[in-house]
A protein has these predicted regions:
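Long, charged, low-complexity intrinsically disordered regions
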Residues: 1-83
Length: 83
């Protein structure tokens, strides 16, 4: 079963990008319209890599940094394309 959240904050960029791609495909196939990507706050390296990947991914309609009660800069909220 696919969760509505992917936690990448303990991953390296090299580990995170393939996992993110697979997760977005799985979430789309599971029918999710919105998912959360947890990348942590840290130095922002992982967040920047996730942002680059989301900009080019064909299943991503839009994305934004999490709000005050969503994890703020440690989380990205992703809206997926419609099926």
């Amino acid at each position: 079963m696919v969760s509505s959240e992917l936690d990448l904050h303990s991953f390296t960029v090299e580990e995170a990008l393939p996992a993110l791609d697979q997760y977005l495909n799985d979430a789309f196939m599971a029918g999710y319209s919105e998912v959360r990507i947890v990348h942590g706050k840290g130095a922002g390296t992982l967040r920047q890599a996730v942002t680059r990947e989301l900009k080019r991914h064909p299943l991503v309609r839009s994305f934004r940094i999490g709000g005050h009660r969503e994890g703020q800069t440690g989380v990205t909220i992703v809206k997926l394309t419609e099926r």
